[in-house]
């Protein structure tokens, strides 16, 4: 009974979290630096978003820093 309740709480939390995540993950990130070059930090991405004019990137904490900034 307790395990069943805990399972239902976890499932409900996962559903609520998935509904709260924005559908458009291509929103502008925050400022980051690739050496002396200023870029835009994208969390949990392995590549820069396409169609935004980025010409380079560097790995950044749990994401990527893409430059140049427009």
From Swiss-Prot:
It comes from the Eukaryota. Keywords: Cleavage on pair of basic residues, Disulfide bond, Ion channel impairing toxin, Nematocyst, Neurotoxin, Potassium channel impairing toxin, Secreted, Signal, Toxin, Voltage-gated potassium channel impairing toxin. One of its GO terms (cellular component) is nematocyst. Residues 22-26 form a propeptide. It holds the Pfam family Defensin_4. Residues 1-21 form the signal peptide. Its main location: secreted. GO terms for molecular function: ion channel inhibitor activity; potassium channel regulator activity; toxin activity. Disulfide bonds join 32-65, 34-58, 48-66. Potently and selectively inhibits voltage-gated potassium channels Kv11/KCNH/ERG. Acts as a gating-modifier toxin that shifts the voltage-dependence of ERG activation in the positive direction and suppresses its current amplitudes elicited by strong depolarizing pulses that maximally activate the channels. Belongs to the sea anemone type 3 (BDS) potassium channel toxin family. This is U-actitoxin-Ael2c.
